[in-house]
Structure formats: C-alpha cells, structure tokens
Amino acid sequence: MHLNVVNLGRCEYEKALQVQIELLEKRQRGEIEDTLILVEHPPVITKGRHADETNIIGSEASLINHGIQLFNTDRGGDVTYHGPGQIVGYPIVNIRKSKIGVKKFVENLEEVLIRLLDEKYHITATRSSVNPGVWVGANKIAAIGLAVKRGVSMHGFALNVSTNLAHFKFLVPCGIADRGVTSIEEILGYPVDFHVANQHVLAYFSEVFNYDIIETVE
C-alpha cells in the first residue's frame, strides 16, 4: 500500500488544521493516497467535541501570558496539550476502504507507539481499555483523538519526546484527573534526538499499517 508523508516541521495549530482539511477532502474524493502529516506545534491547548471547560485550569488570559493558545476542535476526547518536543501525527486515512473499523484503527495507532517505545527506547508502555492513548505506569506518554468524516480519519496522536511537562499544569489531560503525564526524555533522563524519533514514528506507522511505498510530498 502507498503512503504519502507530509512533514510540516514547526507549524501553528491553525495552519496545520487547514492542511488536514485540504488533504481530508482530497482523500475523500480519491485524489490522493493515504497521508500521514507529521508536525510539531507551538504551545496550544485543544478542546475536543466533548471537552469539559473545568478541565482547563486558569483563564485564557493566563494561558496567553504563558504563550499557550487555546483552540476548539471537532476531534473526539477532552482537552489536550501540544507543544515543542512533541511529535504530532495526523493520519488522513480511508478507514472505510481499509475495512478495519475505528476501534481497530485506534488500537493500531497505539501499537505504533508501544512498539516504538519498546524497541527503540526500551520503555514498556501499555494501552488502557478505558482511556485511549499510551501509558507508562500511571502516566500518559501519548494522547490519541480522532475524527472520521465520510470514512476518512483526521486529527490523530501526540507523543511526548522532550515536551515541557510543566505546561500540563494548565489542564487535566484528556479529562483524567488521577493520572499524570511523562515523556521519553523524562523517563530516560537524557536528551533524545527529536528528528530521529520522528523517523521512528514514520517507520513504525508504516510497519503496523502495512504501507510498503512511502513517498514524501510537499
């Protein structure tokens, strides 16, 4: 199977969202192949369709003072933080055509990150039957939140590599109050090459979803 890859580098959330929408519509029309967008965002808190406002701690003004934007989205889930040092992946994938279903698709996204963490960083991570995402003990290392429109996915996953975990004090991540957050660097205790980690994400995404033709596009 064929996978297009779009590397946006450091990109504002709103701009990346517009890219997602454009590619989503093209995939729905069958004009492009399945596509994985990889991006790193400036600090932003996004609210999902079912977000509880009380899970944002502090006013919008206080967030702005700390350089954190606030953005409403149509993905599933509650509130999530994105920021530098976090690999964000937006799979624009025709789930209907693949016939795996949304539940299995989410499990595969979790599998991508669980395998990567185990085989490249010797970190044992797990999934939860209750809360989507990837966990190391009681701490979330990767968040997952999707939207599916006319059979095609958008939004996706966020893996904490060297993320500023102090910014998570401004929210209750994914609305789960009794769990914490962590990152690859926090667990290992030494710096991790972000570019290399980004390449690992692409490699394991391709492996788990059985893409054998990988093409980088603008």
From Swiss-Prot:
GO terms for biological process: protein modification process. Pathway: Protein modification; protein lipoylation via endogenous pathway; protein N(6)-(lipoyl)lysine from octanoyl-[acyl-carrier-protein]: step 1/2. It is found in: Cytoplasm. One of its GO terms (molecular function) is lipoyl(octanoyl) transferase activity. The keyword Transferase applies. Residues 30-213 form the BPL/LPL catalytic domain. One of its GO terms (cellular component) is cytoplasm. Its EC number is 2.3.1.181. Substrate binds at residues 75-82, 143-145, 156-158. The record marks 140 as: Lowers pKa of active site Cys. In the reaction, the free carboxyl group of octanoic acid is attached via an amide linkage to the epsilon-amino group of a specific lysine residue of lipoyl domains of lipoate-dependent enzymes. Belongs to the LipB family. Catalyzes the transfer of endogenously produced octanoic acid from octanoyl-acyl-carrier-protein onto the lipoyl domains of lipoate-dependent enzymes. Lipoyl-ACP can also act as a substrate although octanoyl-ACP is likely to be the physiological substrate. This is Octanoyltransferase. It comes from Alkaliphilus metalliredigens (strain QYMF).
